[in-house]
């Protein structure tokens, strides 16, 4: 969320964000009570963090269950399907797998196994399993950048700035971000890209 909002700002958009955190301090694993998120509204004349979303990124069944009602009909859902096993999606109150039972037919669904894809992207970088798994968000971000028709290079430069002292982590994040972007491109989606209008910003000095 932070990289997306920073990218939006750098290409000339107004940005409003709203991070939210689990409803419980130590909620049961893979339950709705444990869901956190980061909402971004970007474009011209942005006044609030937004209402219903055009793109929803979900990393697990609980995230989908908690947020699906916040997505517009016809919105694009970007979902990591690696945890959509029966025992896990039932914890999120789904009676069947929502990715395959037709219940999401009113949305544009992009479902992929983020975990396996990032492992492949990082296989030659010598990173431990936990570090590789942490790059999953960057795969989702790459897809979102493509859907919003954003310049990939802007986000890559942000990564270089943040992780310049950690070259292995930097290379992993860059590789996974590119993989997500080109994954979406290769799908040849019958989905219109979202055009985000740039804000008219007065001349002056600004700090991010």
Please tell me what each predicted stretch does.
Residues 1-208:
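Active-site cofactor/cluster-binding pocket
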């Amino acid at each position: 969320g932070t990289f997306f909002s920073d990218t939006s700002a750098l290409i000339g958009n107004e940005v409003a964000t709203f991070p939210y955190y689990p409803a419980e301090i130590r909620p049961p694993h893979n339950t709705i009570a444990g869901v956190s998120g980061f909402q971004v509204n970007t474009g011209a004349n942005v006044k609030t963090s937004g209402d219903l979303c055009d793109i929803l990124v979900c990393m697990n069944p609980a995230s989908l269950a908690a947020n699906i009602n916040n997505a517009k009909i016809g919105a694009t859902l970007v979902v990591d399907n690696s945890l959509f096993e029966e025992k896990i999606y039932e914890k999120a109150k789904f009676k069947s797998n929502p990715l395959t039972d037709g219940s999401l037919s009113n949305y544009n669904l992009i479902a992929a196994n983020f975990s396996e894809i990032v492992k492949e992207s990082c296989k030659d970088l010598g990173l431990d399993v936990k570090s590789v798994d942490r790059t999953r968000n960057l795969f989702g971000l790459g897809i979102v950048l493509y859907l919003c028709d954003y310049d990939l290079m802007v986000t890559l430069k942000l990564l270089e700035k943040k992780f310049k002292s950690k070259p292995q982590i930097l290379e992993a994040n860059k590789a996974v971000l590119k993989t997500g972007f080109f994954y979406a491109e290769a799908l040849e989606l019958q989905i219109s890209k979202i055009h985000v209008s740039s804000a008219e910003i007065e001349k002056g000095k600004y700090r991010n």
